[in-house]
Amino acid sequence: MTKIAISLSGGGFRAATFHLGTLSYLNRLKTSNGKPLLDYVNTVSTISGGTLTGLWFLWGKCKGMSNDDILSGLDKILKSSDVIGKASREFLNGDNLNHSLIREMIRIYDEEIFHNATLGDIMDKIDDISIDNFSANATEFTNATEFRFQVGKVIETAKGGFSQGVIGNIFYKIPPKIAQQIKLSEVFAASSCFPGGFEALFYPRDFNFSKDPINKEYVNSVKPLAIMDGGIVDNQGIEPVNLIRKRQNIDLFIISDAGCGKEDPYTFEESDTLSSISIHRLNIIQNIIIAGFASLLLFVPKGYWTGFVSAALIIFLIIRISIALSSRILLNKTTKNIPFTFNWKGLLNINFAKIRSLIGSRATSMIKLTDNVFMKHIRTLNYNTIYQDSQWRNRRIMNALYELCRGKSWGKHLTPDERKIMEPTEAVSNNSDIAASMGTTLWWSEKDRIIGKPAALIAAGQYNICWNLLEYIYRLRRDKTNTTEEHKLIEELQEQLEADWNKFKENPQFLADISKI
């Protein structure tokens, strides 16, 4: 039987919705035996926003739901959910007992999406469904490596042994009896708590099972482990599939990548605003104000106004003295760690425009480093493990959100005739641009809804995977290296794909209403 692996990248609601579109189209494609291509997906790896889509799909399978019901259910959640808004409001409530926003998010996820379901619910049913392997991925900070919440069937290896994926990682392995108590809401939160937006989730302290007296001995034996967004080390979810391939054959690996693909150059705009104000001049202004209040005391008659002026004078004196003393203490401490002499009084004459530039340029460059340079480098390294490995030749597809955006190059492996068929229309490029403009958030803004980003993202997931499967089939016609009889199942879809691609070119959103597919 043909075995397909799919990884669902991170990217907040942008990713979750794009992946929903991808899965819905795989469900639309009917193979020669009448089964949807989605039923041949046996391995799922997810990151951050992609974990919502993947977990919901897996959980629905375990509950015996049809593909149609699973996908339409997630469609409703993504379009109507206000989890972040509700969590923020309730977290700021003075009566709220949760010590962190991410814990409040877990509570809301549990109430509104996963309804108290646990990994144990999936473990009990994994042998009865079409999914053999599932891995929702987070990052643990102690060893700067992946932390996998895995559920899988016991697989016989090529060497004759038996293997099942590790829950956790090589440094921290979670016993199955503990793992089955972990809530799906906690898995999603751990995989998607991105730095800057949320606090780290500490294992096992922040997990619900830690409160059960039965687990006290285990909880006390584990040193708290900080866990955050899986996209920090692998935003495409590639590594778990590489590891699974060592245990079993994979005929096709679809990397569903919801990165927005922006390539804006790094810039920092300098401004002349506040260029006439420095700390020294601010001190002079403060001194003038203090002198002014002191002078008023000589002319204001005794009574209410005397008290008011006296209070204002005292407040300004306290502020002035506090700033002077704290600055002196800070400079003295800092000077001890600097190996050269420096006239620190010169700093007082630097205007605030320069200070803004000094601080702003460093802050924006750090953000650019982590959010762009670092993430792009990690992405390249992860893709290299697939595209530089001959064992993956003709067994991989990158399904990227930004591929068909305006100005992107595409189809370099196609013949001129194939390029004519595959060329995206203006309507397709416009839709892709709208979809790719969605930020990495866990909510829709009013503007997002007005512009139609939810529908644009679903459509982008659908026509991108249609386009990429068709390109894959065209390439296989010229080179069948490393393929088997199992790949004929995919090649037989060519006619369906060509017909749908022509419809997408006319109306990119003709399948965007999930309930009508």
Model-identified regions with their sequence ranges:
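Catalytic domains of lipid- and phosphate-ester/thioester hydrolases
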Residues: 1-517
